[in-house]
């Protein structure tokens, strides 16, 4: 039986998967697509063996998961696709209502930290499907992630727009890790060689993609409303590895999340036993 591997259906994950198509490695796995929250649930319920998941969900369920060492979706500052869009300046959102996209997990906590720690703002939160018009019919501001957020990054209209990657950097000076690649702990223990093989095909895919970003951008621009040049800039604004400063940024995020009651403690980052070729 092929291992079941999750795939976030956002452009920010395309560089990690594009090379799999070029290498025919997709023949060796069963790829299951979904939003971050959908994949979180599938992995935690044992219906996936390996998947990108929201970094906050790894912390909440670390007892049953281990991490691939070299894969994340992260940023050093601006991320472009995790946005707060508001009718009011961010400093004026105390007591206002904010709609949180229900496709998000890490970003919901990140926004709460930015508002409470960075701006001393305490709004009311509601959760909503990621439809901006409907969100703002019931709220004063909205949190969007992924490709729909990227569209509003390009076409900002009349909103106050805040990039949460940039806001995190301004508040902490640290890197931000939004998603990690997690492996079901039982699968990693019983299928260690297969786990290593899947790690290697993803590593090869990532290496290919980083050398062929213009090709990937041209490919994505065929069906997305973005120019190839914009997509190249977008991909370059993201980080996909998991070096030490990103691990430190993630652990700091966990500490702040614990401070506001979103975590019960700060877990260690426990990795699959794979000798990575990428330095940390």
Model-derived features: where do they sit?
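Conserved beta-strand segments of alpha/beta enzyme cores
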Residues: 4, 28-30, 66, 122-124, ...
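Long, low-complexity C-terminal extensions of enzymes
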Residues: 247, 255-280
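Hydrophobic residues within well-ordered alpha-helices
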Residues: 43-44, 135-136, 257
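A local structural motif
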Residues: 23-32, 118-129, 263-269
